[in-house]
UniProtKB/Swiss-Prot annotation:
One of its GO terms (biological process) is hemopoiesis. The modification Phosphoserine is found at residues 560, 614, 643. Residues 633-642 have a biased composition (Basic residues). 3'-exoribonuclease that has a preference for poly(A) tails of mRNAs, thereby efficiently degrading poly(A) tails. Exonucleolytic degradation of the poly(A) tail is often the first step in the decay of eukaryotic mRNAs and is also used to silence certain maternal mRNAs translationally during oocyte maturation and early embryonic development. InterPro entries: CAF1_poly(A)_ribonucleases, Nucleotide-bd_a/b_plait_sf, PARN_R3H, PolyA-riboNase_RNA-binding, R3H_dom, R3H_dom_sf, RBD_domain_sf, RNase_CAF1. One of its GO terms (cellular component) is cytoplasm. CDD domains: R3H_PARN, RRM_PARN. One of its GO terms (molecular function) is metal ion binding. This is Poly(A)-specific ribonuclease PARN.
Length: 660
């Protein structure tokens, strides 16, 4: 169903009910662009740390506008073995609510706009009929404006001037006294004749304040004063003769109108709050940008630090699942060879997967997957949910006896919760939203700085004696170079000691230099370095999320051998994480390599001397696939000891702990 400003108020209750009834919710967003500076390859460097990737996206992607948001709710009908789906396609545009409301500025990227236009995107519908929104800070400011205005009407005094003490009459500036005198004369005439209302000429906001103050102090009873707007959007004062009861009634009506106006201004943010308040599983595809934009646009400014962002994100969306990451992990990675949304949907309609049966209630627009309305946010959210169901049900085939339906609340899905796919990062497959991120070994990586004129071929020439290498550009004058063997690092460092045109650092030295730069931008407190404080955002308990803390390349080359070939002695509690060769054609901007591997699924372990742990009561036994590997569920401390012990194993490109 298409939702615009014209039908949003009517559809909102249905959206909220669908969210409350859903087993899970899938989302998708369309943006006016991706990067305002770096190329996509520089924005998504293969050796970014999670902190670096977050900082880049926060700095270079948040000035674009999320202007179409898709929501699809899925509720499983046990009797019919069918999913009831309700898809909503929201057009969003930050139309200023009033002269004092935020006037949002955003940027567009021509390639993104051109692509959406080629897909039939209706830009007119966005700009003419887009649903407005306010984040929580903006909503609080608007409420304060209403309270201030109401206080001025009741004689509390305006901001720009102060009534003299004890007189009860406001202090009118000399240049406005003639204007106020003429208003008083017109009011006196109104009180003497039979007219019921008086419309004054349009005037400035300051003059309207003076009128409110003067009439409130001089005529405390018998008059109702209200600011209205002409067809030309000009504001004027209307004065009406009323008794006390009528005045109270009109004041109540005005407050109700203001509350409705405020709700209209909050707009689409109410949908996000409903989803957040529900606590339901939120599913997306390659959803890091979707989550960042959603929080930034509808909740509040993104914190500077990654850990603060994780805390905020987990407050807004307690459970997230990324289908791109799910498709890239065991047991799917050996079957699924292309994890783009369209291709993933096609592959999951074939054996060994089974597409789910869905049904759309009468009166709601349903999507036909045969028409492939890709890059319409509502449709993309719909097929993202279908992909999730197909993969979740496939996990049921590993149970004994096999189950054809796996609930969105099943513990079989817990390994995939709150892990968002990291695009093109070679050795860190996901961003762990609910815990510390993986820290791969990068002893074989060098950081090279060089003149701006250098090309990728120059770097390959420089390191030609070291065999296969991989180049990951950072910017125009620096890049990471991954060597095939760690032992070669010292040789490269010694060789470059007296070089004048370039400089080489180990990856550890590179990190140290970045930390020094970070310290230099921090303040010195009495107890040491202190981060610059991040402004807190007022959070209302009425919303679904309340956060009281601070709101926070270019020739064909292959990387090192897979971990299977390098780390035969790895501990059993660690996974076999394979790495596919990454090939590039032409310039680095044409590199499109997804890490096609992740943690083996499933691998359960039991407490020492205890029974094996079943995922859920109805899914009591794992089949032979997992039973042969199952040794019981260990405590977190025990897992940490295993993690530390693994460092004594032969060096690998990276080590990925299992997610169970």
């Amino acid at each position: 169903m298409e939702v615009t400003r014209q039908n949003f108020k009517e559809v909102l209750p249905e959206v909220c009910n669908a969210v409350q009834e859903a087993d899970f919710i899938s989302i998708d967003g369309e943006f006016t662009g991706i990067s305002d500076g770096p190329s996509v390859s520089a924005l998504t460097n293969g050796l970014d740390t999670p902190e670096e990737r977050y900082t880049k996206l926060r700095k270079h992607s948040m000035n674009f506008l999320l202007f179409q948001f898709g929501v699809c709710t899925f509720r499983y009908d046990q009797n019919q073995s069918t999913y009831i789906t309700k898809a909503f396609n929201f057009y969003i545009f930050p139309k200023p609510f009033s002269r004092t409301s935020p006037d949002i500025k955003f940027i567009c990227q021509s390639s993104s706009i051109d692509f959406l236009a080629s897909q039939g995107f209706d830009f007119n519908k966005v700009f003419r009929s887009g649903i407005p929104y306010l984040n929580q800070e903006e909503e609080c400011q608007l409420r304060e404006q209403y309270e201030e205005r109401r206080g001025q009407m009741n004689g509390a005094g305006p901001v720009s001037y102060t009534p003299p003490s004890g007189t009860g009459v406001c202090n009118v500036p000399e240049d406005q006294r003639e204007f106020i005198r003429s208003v008083e004369e017109k009011v006196e005439a109104l009180l003497k004749n039979t007219d019921q209302t008086l419309d004054l000429e349009p005037c400035t906001g300051f003059q309207r304040k003076l009128i409110y103050q003067t009439l409130n102090s001089k005529y405390s009873k018998g008059l109702h004063v209200e600011a209205l707007e002409t067809e030309k959007k000009e504001r004027f004062i209307q004065i009406s003769k009323v008794d006390d009861e009528e005045r109270r009634r009109r004041e109540q009506q005005k407050q109700q109108r203001e509350q409705e106006e405020l709700n209209d201004a909050v707009g689409f943010s109410r949908v996000i709050r409903a989803i957040s308040k529900s606590g339901k599983l939120v599913v997306g595809h390659n959803m890091l940008l979707d989550v960042m934009h959603t929080i930034h646009q509808f909740c509040g400014p993104l914190p500077e630090e990654l850990d603060d962002f994780k805390e905020v994100a987990m407050t807004v969306f307690p459970r997230l699942l990324d289908t791109k990451l799910m498709a890239s992990t065991q047991p799917f990675k050996e079957i699924i060879h292309n994890t783009s949304l369209a291709e993933l949907h096609k592959q999951l309609r074939q054996k060994p997967f089974r597409p789910p049966t869905t049904e759309c209630p009468e009166g709601l627009q349903s999507y036909d997957t045969s028409t492939e309305q890709l890059h319409e946010a509502g449709y993309d959210a719909f097929i993202t949910g279908l992909c999730f169901i197909s993969m979740a049900n496939y996990l049921g085939s590993f149970l004994t006896p096999p189950k054809s339906h796996i609930s969105a609340r099943s513990k079989l899905l817990e390994p995939f919760y709150n892990k968002l796919f990291l695009m093109r990062v070679i050795d860190i497959p996901y961003l762990n939203m609910s815990g510390p991120d993986l820290q791969p070994k990068r002893d074989h990586v060098l950081y090279v700085t060089f003149p701006k004129e250098w090309k990728t071929s120059d770097l390959y020439q420089l390191f030609s004696a070291f065999g296969n290498i991989q180049v990951s550009w950072v910017d125009d004058t620096s890049a990471f170079v991954s060597l095939s063997q760690t032992e070669q690092v010292q040789i490269a460092m010694n060789t470059s000691r007296y070089a004048e045109s370039y400089r080489i650092q180990t990856y550890a030295e590179y990190l140290q230099s970045r930390q020094k730069n970070t310290h230099s931008s921090r303040k010195w407190a009495s107890d040491g370095w202190a981060d610059t404080s991040y402004p807190s955002v007022a959070m209302t308990t009425a919303s679904g999320y309340s956060h009281t803390d601070n709101w926070h390349q270019a020739v064909k080359r292959s990387i090192s051998p897979s971990l299977d070939e390098q780390n035969h002695g790895a501990d059993s509690s660690w996974t076999n994480y394979s790495v596919k060769k990454i090939k590039t054609e032409g310039s680095c901007t044409q590199t499109y390599a997804d890490v096609a591997g992740s943690c083996d699924w499933p691998r359960l372990q039991a407490d020492e001397g205890g029974a094996s742990v079943s995922p859920v009561a109805e899914e009591a036994e794992l089949d032979e696939f997992s039973a042969n590997q199952s040794q019981g569920k260990r405590s977190r401390k025990h897992k940490k000891r295993k993690s530390d012990a693994s460092e004594t194993t032969p060096p690998a490109l990276f080590d990925v702990p299992q997610v169970w």
